[in-house]
Amino acid sequence: KNSKILDIGCGRANIISALQKKYKFRNKPIGIDIIANKNVKKNIVFKKIDALKYLEKKEKYDLILIKQTIHFFTNKRLNRLLNLAKKRLNPKGKLLIFSLKTKNNKIPCFKKMKIKLQKSLKRDEYLFKIIKKNLKYTKDFYFNFKVVISKKKYLWMIKSRYISCLLELKEKEVNKGLDEIKLKYKNNIKFVDTLKCILFSK
């Protein structure tokens, strides 16, 4: 009940919102992001701020989440993020770092998207090494999520560049990719989304 939670790169804050709904913490979980998502959940505290800047505050937490965000950091900034996160954990506090599984990833892609995703996942593997070296004592877990999504919604997600590997693609490339997905899939798209989780305990 008294746990303090911070979600770095929270997006819409779905995870901490679900935790708050279930456990009703006295301190509302805090979600930070450099982009204010218009659909951010209302039962958490959202702050639009850079993670490194926020972690320089002396506030302590029992749980810090970093979900699918590491690829936005340079090596130097990632090490700084990890060092600050460790400092901000209470005794017995946990740091959870989530990222996409890098091998045999099943996310439905068009050709250009696949190339960008593979490049991003290759870099993630390198970043995992930096994380392991910095945190030293960690445990790895994998979570499988069965996804069933309508083709219409998935096309909207691609068009909105909801998946970060799409951010660098030109509009023409995205539009061509939309046509590829339209031809490749019927009404519903089914796949298994696997997340890797690195756990550090203070």
Each model region followed by its residue ranges:
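Conserved class I S-adenosyl-L-methionine
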Residues: 96-122
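Short glycine-centered segments of the SAM/dcSAM-binding site in methyltransferase folds
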Residues: 4, 93-94
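A conserved beta-strand element that flanks and buttresses the S-adenosyl-L-methionine
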Residues: 65
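Conserved Class I S-adenosyl-L-methionine
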Residues: 139-202
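Short alpha-helix
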Residues: 120-134
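Short catalytic micro-motifs in class I SAM-dependent methyltransferases
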Residues: 68-69
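A short glycine-rich, Lys/Arg-flanked "PGG" loop and its adjoining helix->strand segment in the class I
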Residues: 79-91
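Class I SAM-dependent methyltransferase SAM/SAH-binding core
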Residues: 6, 11-54
